């Protein structure tokens, strides 16, 4: 069995990877600093960040497969990252209220044994339902929107805010499992392997 290393401290990514391959992976959060690169398209920027995270974690291992991801919400040409205080979460939710937006993830899988690195992006369209100001504030008060791209959690209480999703639901949570499975297959790793059960 190949050693799998998740380059993320995100509880959501850990849980999604666990659904795919069980508990057979290590968690090694990256300390990569995301430099501002305003000239890049958002998809390219997220891929660059995922590459940076994977390569940062690779410094600590000589063997294994490193998985890293970077997710943001795109609305009207603006990249909405993770709000770190309630007022910012409220502002983001008011922008997305009753509108369609896109969740984009840059995904990198780095095979240290073969020196292969595969990076791709995944996009998911999301339609948020309309909420009044009190509903937005009530959701913000739960604390759930903090530290979530776009200030919502599709897998938590935020699920009731989502009217419709087109594309990979798991991408909207932070790790596109379909694309990840296909990349692992390219590297000779099957999620159906008995060692992952």
From Swiss-Prot:
Q: Which EC number(s) does UniProt give?
A: 3.6.1.9
A Pfam family that this protein carries is Maf
List the residues marked with site Important for substrate specificity. Answer: 12, 71, 155
Highest rank taxon of the organism: Archaea
Gene Ontology cellular-component terms for this entry are:
cytoplasm
- Does this UniProt record's set of keywords contain Manganese? no
Substrates-to-products reaction catalysed: dTTP + H2O = dTMP + diphosphate + H(+); UTP + H2O = UMP + diphosphate + H(+)
Q: Which GO terms describe its biological process?
A: nucleotide metabolic process
Q: What is its main location?
A: cytoplasm
Arranged from A to Z, the UniProt key words for this protein are: Cytoplasm, Hydrolase, Nucleotide metabolism
Q: Which InterPro entries match?
A: ITPase-like_fam, Maf-like
Q: Give the positions the UniProt entry annotates as the active site.
A: 70
GO MF annotation: an example: UTP diphosphatase activity
- Please give the cofactor(s) recorded in the UniProt entry for this protein: a divalent metal cation
Localization, per the record, is: Cytoplasm
- What family is this? Belongs to the Maf family. YhdE subfamily.
Q: Which HAMAP family match?
A: Maf
Function per UniProt: Nucleoside triphosphate pyrophosphatase that hydrolyzes dTTP and UTP. May have a dual role in cell division arrest and in preventing the incorporation of modified nucleotides into cellular nucleic acids.
Query: Protein name, please?
Result: dTTP/UTP pyrophosphatase
Organism of origin is: Methanosarcina mazei (strain ATCC BAA-159 / DSM 3647 / Goe1 / Go1 / JCM 11833 / OCM 88)
Q: Lineage from the top down?
A: Archaea, Methanobacteriati, Methanobacteriota, Stenosarchaea group, Methanomicrobia
């Amino acid at each position: 069995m190949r050693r799998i290393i998740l380059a993320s401290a995100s509880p959501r990514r850990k849980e999604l990877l666990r659904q795919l391959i069980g508990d057979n992976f290590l968690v090694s959060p990256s300390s990569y600093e995301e430099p501002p690169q305003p000239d890049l398209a958002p998809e390219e920027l997220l891929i660059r960040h995922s590459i940076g995270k994977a390569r940062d974690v690779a410094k600590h291992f000589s063997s294994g497969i490193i998985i890293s991801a970077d997710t943001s919400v795109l609305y009207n040409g603006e990249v909405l990252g993770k709000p770190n205080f309630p007022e910012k979460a409220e502002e983001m939710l008011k922008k997305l209220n009753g509108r369609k937006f896109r969740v984009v993830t840059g995904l990198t899988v780095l095979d240290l044994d073969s020196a292969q690195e595969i990076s791709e992006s995944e996009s998911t369209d999301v339609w948020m339902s309309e909420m009044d100001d009190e509903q937005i504030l009530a959701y913000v008060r739960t604390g759930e929107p903090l530290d979530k791209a776009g200030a919502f959690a599709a897998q938590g209480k935020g699920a009731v805010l989502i009217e419709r999703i087109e594309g990979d639901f798991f991408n909207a949570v932070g790790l596109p499992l379909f694309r990840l499975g296909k990349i692992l297959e390219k590297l000779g790793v099957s999620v159906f392997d008995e060692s992952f059960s």
